[in-house]
């Protein structure tokens, strides 16, 4: 499915919509996704989407969501709890904190730059999102 998100606000709002939908699914006892993988170029909207997603979860209304490029993982006290990881600076083997997060069966793990995870290390029950950006010039 292709969805056009022309600006940051529409990207945040789409994140909110999916966050609310996932929260409803959890509340109704539906299948629980524990890991969401994000693929996409630098600046394509992965963290912006994540901001809206986390804000939509109970407890996330006032969360200060930022890219965990330097910390590798940020935790948020939402319901369900969220661990937000960024593999942009990761090379080779997964850092321990990311590897441990991927093994969790409670809460949610959101991983940016998922293309840096070797195929054999990918969990089975995941959502995958690919972000693409385009710049139009000359208008």
What function would you assign to each model-found segment?
Residues 60-76:
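Short beta-strand-centered segment that lines the nucleotide-binding/catalytic pocket of NTP-utilizing
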Residues 36-38:
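Hydrophobic anchor at the beta1->P-loop junction of P-loop NTPases
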Residues 1-25:
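N-terminal pre-Walker A segment at the start of P-loop NTPase domains
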Residues 42:
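The conserved Walker
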Residues 46:
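Conserved lysine of the Walker
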Residues 84-91:
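Switch II (G3) loop of P-loop NTPases
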Residues 93, 99-139:
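Short phosphate-coordinating micro-motif centered on Lys-Gly-acidic
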């Amino acid at each position: 499915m292709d969805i056009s998100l022309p600006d940051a606000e529409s990207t945040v709002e789409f994140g909110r919509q999916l966050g609310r939908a996932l929260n409803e699914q959890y509340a109704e006892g539906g299948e629980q996704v524990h890991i969401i993988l994000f693929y996409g170029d630098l600046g394509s909207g992965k963290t912006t989407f994540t901001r809206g997603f986390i804000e939509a979860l109970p407890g996330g209304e006032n969360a200060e969501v930022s890219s965990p490029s330097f910390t590798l993982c940020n935790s948020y006290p939402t319901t369900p709890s969220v661990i937000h990881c960024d593999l942009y600076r990761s090379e080779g083997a997964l850092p321990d904190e990311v590897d441990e997060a991927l093994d969790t069966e409670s809460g949610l793990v959101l991983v940016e730059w998922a293309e840096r995870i070797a195929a054999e290390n990918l969990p089975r029950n995941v959502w995958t999102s690919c972000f693409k950006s385009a710049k139009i010039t000359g208008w």
